[in-house]
């Protein structure tokens, strides 16, 4: 992992609030994974064996309904993390993840992270706080989806891209 990769990972919402020694422990065993446009990172209902931080590119999180239609849940960009809550629980991914551009990701092994959390109360408390912040962001996202028209959501998305 390059110094720039480490900076991006350290500044992610998942790790930014952690004390530096804990951040270093989490990233110690992490790997950089490169994916091409259209490449599947994981599928809905796969065992959640890792969580990810986007270094570069865009990743789409989506669900396939029983009717076979695809519902995009979120689009992740640089510095955003995904898969953390379910990976920490040891469950299955509730969504699929696919690169929509060439992308580079930090892949953090879920079992290793769960072991770290059990042995380090400071890390466990900090990760819990980070997960809570992520939950707040998801609640705000649902509110935006329900309270805005499609045109308003597209305009807001484009404004976010320009920022």
Q: Can you say where each PLM-predicted feature lies in the sequence?
A:
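Conserved active-site beta-strand element of glycosyltransferases/polysaccharide synthases
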Residues: 106
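Short capping/connector residues at structural and topological boundaries
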Residues: 19-23, 46-47, 87, 93, ...
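Cyclic nucleotide-binding regulatory domains
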Residues: 14, 39-102
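Cyclic nucleotide-binding regulatory module and flanking cytosolic helices
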Residues: 1-37, 81-82, 86-87
């Amino acid at each position: 992992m390059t110094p720039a990769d480490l900076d991006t990972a350290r500044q992610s919402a998942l790790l930014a609030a952690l004390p530096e020694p804990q951040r270093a422990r989490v990233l110690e065993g992490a790997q950089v994974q490169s994916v091409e446009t259209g490449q599947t990172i994981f599928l809905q209902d796969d065992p959640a064996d890792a969580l990810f931080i986007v270094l570069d590119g865009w990743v789409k999180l989506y669900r396939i309904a029983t009717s076979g239609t695809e519902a995009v849940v979120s689009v992740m960009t640089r510095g955003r993390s995904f898969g953390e809550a379910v990976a920490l629980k040891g469950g299955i991914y509730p969504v699929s993840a696919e690169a929509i551009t060439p992308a580079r990701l930090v892949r953090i092994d879920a079992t290793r992270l769960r072991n770290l959390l059990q042995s380090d109360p400071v890390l466990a408390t900090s990760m819990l706080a980070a997960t809570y912040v992520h939950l707040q962001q998801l609640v705000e996202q649902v509110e935006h989806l329900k309270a805005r028209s499609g045109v308003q959501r597209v305009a807001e998305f484009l404004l976010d891209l320009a920022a």
